[in-house]
Amino acid sequence: MVKLFKLNLLIIFFSFSAFNDSVAQTVLTNAFAHNDYKHKRPLLDALNYGVANIEADIFLYKNKLVVAHVLPYFRKNKTLEKLYLQPLFERFACQDDIYSGYNKPIILMIDVKTNASKTYLKLKEVLQKYQSILTSYDNGKITERAVTVVISGNKPYELMEKECQRFAFIDDNLKNMTSDSTKNLCLMASAKYSNITSWNGKQPISILQKLKLCEFIKQAHTEGKKVRLWAIPQNPTVWKMLMDCGIDLINSDNLEKMRSFFAKKHAAPFIAQAQ
């Protein structure tokens, strides 16, 4: 049995190695693979591109955590464990890192589509099996490990806030951040891009628009939270402006476009006079 397990790990290791040879493993610390499960090879494609932040939507369906955006019935065998947790665990077992030589956690964002409390209780049960690779909270202390799980969507704030130990954190609402006196519950803050600004990158951004955006990001950073905006224009000019404001994560479904963006130097976006 032990020999078989070791053989499986070797096969996985060489599979990852062969796959990663095709693309240099530069870790894209600011890239966020939105709706990652829609790619041909969920998780693996993102890892191939060096993405350090990955999202999966889940439904609690027949006591399983099914990865899907809608209609989990048609994807009932595509579970969070099979597509994400088990492969990450096996990859770490092979090389002691998710990315060789990269000693920071990657983020696995789990967007909960069903009841917050019921789904979290099942998620908690599943995460226990992989606790050796998961960042943990234990009586006021955070211990970073290879993978940090962050819950978005339907979030069980009260349930998680009462826990003395857990292996998940919360993605806060950037526009209405919760008071987190311990700074140990919410490690991120997100909002829909259009709820912050309407700028699409096709014309100069006003100074006031940019200041407003930068202020949201600055406020989150003072509370120790990484910032992500979703449904952002897929325009490198907008992305560059967001990076100039100090945003932590660029949100996109397009892995190639993100890698290309982070590989190039960009001219500063135009800024119009205040309106």
Where are these regions (language model features)?
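Bacterial Sec-dependent N-terminal signal peptides
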Residues: M1-T26, Q275
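Phosphate-group recognition and catalysis centered on beta-loop-alpha active-site segments
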Residues: V23-Q275
